[in-house]
Swiss-Prot record:
Protein source organism: Mus musculus
Keyword Transmembrane applies: yes
Active-site residues per Swiss-Prot or TrEMBL entry: 164, 206
Family recorded in the similarity comment: Belongs to the peptidase C13 family.
UniProt topology in membrane: Single-pass type I membrane protein
Sorted UniProt keywords: Calcium, Disulfide bond, Endoplasmic reticulum, GPI-anchor biosynthesis, Membrane, Metal-binding, Signal, Transferase, Transmembrane, Transmembrane helix
Domain of life, per lineage: Eukaryota
Lumenal side: 28-368
Protein name: GPI-anchor transamidase
EC class: transferase
GO molecular function: GPI-anchor transamidase activity
List of residues binding a protein: 206, 232, 234
Gene giving rise to this polypeptide: Pigk
Residue span of region Autoinhibitory loop: 231-236
Amino acid sequence: MAAPCFLTLRVATLAALALLSLGSSAAGHIEDQAEQFFRSGHTNNWAVLVCTSRFWFNYRHVANTLSVYRSVKRLGIPDSHIVLMLADDMACNARNPKPATVFSHKNMELNVYGDDVEVDYRSYEVTVENFLRVLTGRVPPSTPRSKRLLSDDRSNILIYMTGHGGNGFLKFQDSEEITNIELADAFEQMWQKRRYNELLFIIDTCQGASMYERFYSPNIMALASSQVGEDSLSHQPDPAIGVHLMDRYTFYVLEFLEEINPASQTNMNDLFQVCPKSLCVSTPGHRTDLFQRDPKNVLITDFFGSVRKVEITTEKISLQWDSQVVDSSSKEDGTAEERMGPLKYAEQLPVAQIIHQKPKPRDWHPPGGFILGLWALIIMVFFKTYGIKHMKFIF
């Protein structure tokens, strides 16, 4: 009896050890997956969007910046991760025929100002000093959280700038300028302080390519709307407000981004081709020698979208359709069939259709000068016929 009992005990012990080893290997595999996720080089995205121009005739630069702002928000980057700097408030300008709006298309249907724009730096707060402080994190202790770039070594950062520039500089509000050397040194400080993982720099200005010539920090990809010696041209003049609505390069970038959704597999090589010389008139440029990855392997959403976090779990969750909940809720909000329809990524407006449709014909109204002239003619005829003594019958 002793031998069979010993054999049974040995078999049970071996089985227990086998189960324990399987469990430990499975747990180890899950731990490896979790460790790989949390040690990945990219866990969050940030955006710094800067318009450096003042005055009404620079309406298009504000529209450029707000268009990019709208796109990154639509793709999932929250306002808490966006630093928006606008040097002028075109929405409240006295010359704006439609107050509290900024339009990027002739048909006046795509209002990029929207109802939930959070401007972090406005008017005279938009300076070279404040911009460099935001990038390097050297802000006063009293600076609110919304005005800080709270990035780290796992952050991918999109920096978009638009305004008036020249060979090696970009003007801020026609009163000061930032040079390509100052910008390159600021990016180097960011790298040394571990404030970014990868950085995408986009600039829409005249001779924009000169602004990234001095970059020397790793993991930077740069795009510009024009080469050295070229002007970056405007697009879509609107007689109603008397200025152009956008710049050509940003217009076609916006048109490209509106076709992107958070699950898109479109890569950076596609972004390089959005505005050829035949459309932009200027020659867009890009620089990738400092970037470690091949642009064809870099998704657009790595910079323009949110990072969707994944939580690893071993528990099984059973999802069952609760007909009672659906029936009770359908009485208030609609039928169950409507709720069971396929869900799509939310879009504020059918932008792709708005961009390509023709402007609406404007209603004709007699000009003010015509009306004044008509009244003057009537008064002259009255004086000619009746004289000044009958003036009291008019007023």
